[in-house]
């Protein structure tokens, strides 16, 4: 019972902390945030939201506030494309050029380009 009284006294001396600074006042530094920092944070947050919405629209044409579903991402990774080409133009509809050779292939920036694999017919 005498041990429990010592523990209670020790907790009161440490102010609830047992970090080895018994009986010493705590030296916590409390940093206040300025209005400018708060404004800057929210500006950055808005930019991230705008960028996310823009990427979501470009990648799948989804409604605002929704990101592409896992199923859509999976189908895009497998090469199952929708009717829109990467640049938003339907395949050969507006520019009247039939593209042969690159449809269904992913773009790999690490490989060297092969100019013979692309053929345009007018």
UniProtKB/Swiss-Prot annotation:
Disordered, as annotated region: 1-28
Induction per the UniProt record: By salicylic acid (SA) and BTH.
InterPro entries with a match to the protein in the record: NIMIN-2 (IPR034577)
Motif Nuclear localization signal location, chain numbering: 70-74
Chief location category: nucleus
Cellular location(s): Nucleus
One example of a Gene Ontology biological process annotation: regulation of systemic acquired resistance
Stretches for region Involved in NPR1/NIM1 interaction: 39-45
A GO cellular component entry from the record: nucleus
Coiled-coil blocks: none
Domain of life assignment: Eukaryota
Record keyword Nucleotide-binding present: no
Keywords of this entry: Nucleus
Extent of Basic and acidic residues compositional bias: 1-22
Subunit structure: Interacts with NPR1 N-terminal region.
Protein name, entry field: Protein NIM1-INTERACTING 2
Organism ancestry: Eukaryota, Viridiplantae, Streptophyta, Embryophyta, Tracheophyta
């Amino acid at each position: 019972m005498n041990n429990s009284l010592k523990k209670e006294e020790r907790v009161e001396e440490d102010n609830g902390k047992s970090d080895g600074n018994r009986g010493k006042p705590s030296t916590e530094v409390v940093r206040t945030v300025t209005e400018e920092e708060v404004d800057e944070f929210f500006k950055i947050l808005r930019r991230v939201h705008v960028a996310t919405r823009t990427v979501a629209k470009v990648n799948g044409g989804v409604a605002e506030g929704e990101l592409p579903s896992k199923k859509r991402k999976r189908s895009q990774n497998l090469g199952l494309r929708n009717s829109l080409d990467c640049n938003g133009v339907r395949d050969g509809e507006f520019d009247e050029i039939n593209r042969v050779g690159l449809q269904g292939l992913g773009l790999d920036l690490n490989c060297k380009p092969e100019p013979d694999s692309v053929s345009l017919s007018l």
